[in-house]
């Protein structure tokens, strides 16, 4: 199952969309390998890396988790919704959604949202 992420606003992203995707995926993969892949640790690691990339922005990271309790995620038997609203300058601020794959088939999906706001 894939999350629908058509609402991205990445045209003004401080990090290119492909690099942001890789940052999220590699951070999660590294945490999984070290046995420390908690949502809290993922948030902390992502924010540290984003802050070191550019001091011209403030970053907000949101992680929505979907657990089905089964090894496969069946899009007909689960629902997740997450809404984020903001008042910002659309020329400088934006957001990006990334669907972390369930590589180990544990029935857990994470949707990571990165928001940047110009200082």
UniProtKB/Swiss-Prot annotation:
Gene3D superfamilies the record matches: Tctex-1
Matching CDD domains: DLC-like_TDA2
Highest taxon in the source lineage: Eukaryota
Keywords: Cell projection, Cytoplasm
Cellular location(s): Cytoplasm; Cell projection
GO CC terms: cell projection; cytoplasm
Family the entry assigns: Belongs to the TDA2 family.
Descriptive protein name: Topoisomerase I damage affected protein 2
Organism name: Zygosaccharomyces rouxii (strain ATCC 2623 / CBS 732 / NBRC 1130 / NCYC 568 / NRRL Y-229)
Lineage: Eukaryota, Fungi, Dikarya, Ascomycota, Saccharomycotina
């Amino acid at each position: 199952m894939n999350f629908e992420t058509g609402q991205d606003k990445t045209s003004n992203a401080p990090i290119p969309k492909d690099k942001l995707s890789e940052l999220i995926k590699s951070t999660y993969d590294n945490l999984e390998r070290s046995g420390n892949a908690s949502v809290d640790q993922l948030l902390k690691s992502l924010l540290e890396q984003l802050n070191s990339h550019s001091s011209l922005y403030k970053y907000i990271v949101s992680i929505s988790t979907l657990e089905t309790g089964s090894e496969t995620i069946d899009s007909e038997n689960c629902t997740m919704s997450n809404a984020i609203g903001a008042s910002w300058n659309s020329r400088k601020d934006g957001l990006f959604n990334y669907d972390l794959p369930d590589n180990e088939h544990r029935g857990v999906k994470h949707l990571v949202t990165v928001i940047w706001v110009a200082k």
